[in-house]
Curated annotation (Swiss-Prot):
Keyword Secreted: no
InterPro entries: Glyco_hydro_20_cat, Glycoside_hydrolase_SF, HEXDC-like
Protein name: Hexosaminidase D
Tissue: Expressed in synovial fibroblasts and synovial membranes.
EC number(s) from the headed UniProt entry: 3.2.1.52
Protein family per UniProt: Belongs to the glycosyl hydrolase 20 family.
Keyword terms: Cytoplasm, Disulfide bond, Glycosidase, Hydrolase, Nucleus
Main location: cytoplasm
MF term (GO), any: beta-N-acetylhexosaminidase activity
Length: 486
């Protein structure tokens, strides 16, 4: 299958608010991105950006240094990947508003997600963030200013008072802040075009949107990560945006991080269907209105949620989706090319450790993560809840009272020790692989969430077995000092 893609720009989204890769791993993976068909990156730095001055407290423990940002941009340039930085400026501001120093700028005092658009200090804050990001991205042509999922907008005290005035609405409030931020970007760097996520714009009346001045300032990114995307609805939305005056639009799909907050390995078929439907949207919508597509790879649903699929685990899905976009479909030839590029035997494999992990950077992480996600909990469950000797002779009742028929120890202990040894070996290998690609806090978090609970259940069983099967201490007479000579 061959064909020209309607998406001239194909950007891979790097969501750094969880498990940010080390620069050394990015140096290995960027050439693969290019080989797969990407020509740009959307980098959502969040707390990994090296903010300075009063913003320094936003930095994560292992935030990139300015020199590392320059190295990332250099690596991207070597691989002909345009970098678009993303700075959240309205919703999803938890990484800023969680700090006491900025808590007074929350739209709703108890929730750190949304910025209060009425405070002049709010605009100064996002302006300072944008200044620092643009300073370290001197060649940036575009800047994504977020503005998605602005939850609880209109529910703060200042907003409630403002909304009591005639002709005011949450839509008007949203557009006003978006316009102010985008105008600030253009004032700072006239050559930079701001991008925004489109969800806060979708339901606004056309006349309000057209009259707001926003269409002359930003390019909206229409996002939908579902496998049953409403193609006709998206085409109508594109037509609406064009009528409102937006000259250029973008699409956003997903290659990972969109099928559950604790997903470990992306379901490739889901993501392929999502991209097939985006191709249908591009083919049916206004001609040449789509600048490109952003393949999002979310790493957390928000700042406080657990980690979803790690970047190496998402590479096969990303590869399949990029090649589908380039070739206009996903037949056996395209599938074979993806498998060849990644050095894997099959995209559908269920046991990469046995069938071959692949040759792409981080392929060993994918293989080991797949083993853990498919088999760790189920194997421990099988022992603790499916083994007749455990359920019949060493139940929670028995364990609490330290009771067991001595003969049963030999039926339970060897199996538990063998299972623990098997998983301990694999987990050591996984931890070593993770440490090469990620910082210590991400390694610790992933293992604590996905590995330790099951291993601790196994270790607790063995500890209880050890205690119950230990030889009893010799009895002593009540009140008699055992150390006393007869």
């Amino acid at each position: 299958m061959s064909g020209s893609t309607p998406f001239q720009m194909r950007l891979v989204h790097l969501d750094l608010k969880g498990a940010p890769p080390k620069v050394s791993y990015l140096s290995e993976i960027f050439p693969l991105f290019r080989a797969l068909g990407a020509n740009g990156l959307l980098i959502e730095y969040e707390d990994m950006f090296p903010y300075e001055g009063p913003l320094r407290l936003l930095r994560a423990k292992y935030a990139y240094s300015p020199s590392e940002i320059k190295e990332i941009l250099h690596l991207a340039g070597l691989n002909e990947l345009e970098v678009i930085p993303l700075v959240q400026t309205f919703g999803h501001m938890e990484f800023v508003l969680k700090h006491t120093a900025f808590a007074h700028l929350r739209e709703v005092g108890s929730f750190p997600c949304t910025l209060n658009p009425h405070e002049a200090e709010s605009l100064a804050l996002v302006g300072a963030m944008i200044d620092q990001v643009l300073e370290l991205h001197p060649g940036a042509q575009r800047l994504h200013i977020g503005c998605d999922e602005v939850y609880y907008l209109g529910e703060g005290e200042a907003s409630r008072r403002w909304l009591q005035q005639e002709q005011n609405s949450t839509g008007k409030l949203c557009l006003s802040h978006m316009r102010a931020v985008a105008s600030g970007v253009k004032a700072r760097r006239p050559s930079v075009t701001p991008l925004v996520w489109d969800d806060m714009l979708r339901d606004l009346p056309e006349d309000q949107l057209a009259a707001s001045g926003v269409p002359q300032l930003v390019e909206p990114v229409l996002w939908d990560y579902t496998a049953d995307l409403d193609v006709h609805g998206k085409v109508l939305l594109m037509q609406k945006y064009r009528r409102c005056g937006f000259p250029q639009l973008w699409a956003a799909s997903a290659f990972k991080g969109a099928t559950g907050p604790s997903q470990a390995v992306p379901p490739v078929e889901h993501h392929l269907r999502n991209h097939v439907q985006w191709l249908q949207v591009a083919g049916s919508g206004p001609t040449d209105s789509l600048q490109g597509i952003i393949l999002t790879g979310w790493q957390r649903y928000d700042h406080y949620s657990v980690l979803c699929e790690l970047l190496p685990a998402g590479v096969p899905s990303l590869a399949a989706c990029l090649q589908l976009l380039l070739r206009g479909g996903f037949d056996e030839d395209v599938k074979a090319k993806v498998e060849n590029l990644l050095g894997i035997s099959s995209l559908e494999k269920t046991d990469p450790v046995r069938e071959g992990a692949g040759s792409f950077p981080g392929s060993n992480i994918l293989a080991l993560v797949t083993q853990v996600s498919l088999h760790l909990r189920s194997s421990v469950d099988a022992l603790l809840e499916g083994n007749r000797y455990v359920t019949g002779w060493f139940s929670p009742y028995h364990r609490q009272r330290k009771l067991i028929h001595p003969v049963m120890v030999q039926h339970i202990q060897p199996a538990a020790l063998s299972l623990l040894a098997q998983w301990s070996t694999l987990v050591q290998e996984l931890e070593a692989a993770l440490q090469l690609a990620f910082y210590p806090d991400a390694v610790e978090e992933w293992l604590e969430e996905n590995v330790h609970p099951s291993l601790q259940r196994l270790q607790a069983l063995l500890q209880d077995l050890s205690e119950v099967s230990a030889p009893p201490l010799p009895p002593t007479s009540p009140g008699r000092d055992v150390a006393q000579d007869p």
